[in-house]
Regions:
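Structural preference for solvent-exposed beta-strand-turn elements
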Residues: 1-195
């Protein structure tokens, strides 16, 4: 879960909180979230919540700690100063955290306006069109791809000023018409991430 969320943690930022992973156990599930304000990834992990709460922990350090822990049960306990104790078998690590309230949450998506497409098909579409997006920010619109749904057809268009790639597929079921430009960085992350 941490490795997936790390894809959305920026390498450099002026907002220190974005260098963190949010661990949110305020509901009945444990959510790990990374967000660089352009790409946000949230993943849900199984676990037992003894006391509800949330904390933002420096992502790179947390990722290194988790990677080196044995494949066993991990317990995270956070005090009122957001210092977190990570326990796994004989390992105990204290790490400074920050208030989870300061973390930039992901937008809430209206599930009434969604399309359903297989993970394989989505990755295939991205891989067949992403090469024709612009690599720099001179024109923001060209660094992403147009996703257009019209009459139950999804059209994906990548354009960099010299090349164009278009892919059309028919969607199952009924879908509302919509046009949205998805940043290339986001599409690259989706293409390389195992989704569930």
């Amino acid at each position: 879960a941490v490795g997936i969320v790390m894809k959305a943690v920026p390498v450099r930022t002026t907002m220190n909180i974005l260098e963190c992973i949010l661990i949110d156990a305020t509901t009945n599930v444990i959510k790990f979230t990374g967000n660089d304000m352009e790409l946000g990834i949230e993943t849900i992990v199984d676990g037992e919540i003894l006391e509800k709460g949330k904390v933002a922990i420096e992502a790179k350090l947390f990722s290194e700690i988790v990677r080196k822990l044995p494949d066993s049960e991990v317990t995270i306990t956070t005090d009122s100063n957001y210092t977190s104790l990570i326990t796994c078998e004989n390992s105990k690590i204290n790490i400074a955290g920050k208030s989870g309230d300061d973390f930039s949450y992901l937008p809430i998506i209206d599930k009434d306006k969604m399309i359903t497409i297989s993970q394989f098909k989505l990755k295939e579409i991205i891989n067949q069109t992403i090469f024709s997006t612009a690599p720099n920010d001179n024109n923001k619109m060209m660094t992403g791809e147009l996703f257009e749904v019209s009459e139950n057809t999804l059209k994906v268009v990548g354009l960099d000023g010299h090349r164009i790639a278009i892919r059309n597929i028919t969607l199952e079921g009924r879908a509302d018409d919509v046009k949205v430009v998805v940043p290339g960085k986001t599409l690259q992350a989706v293409s390389y991430t195992h989704l569930t």
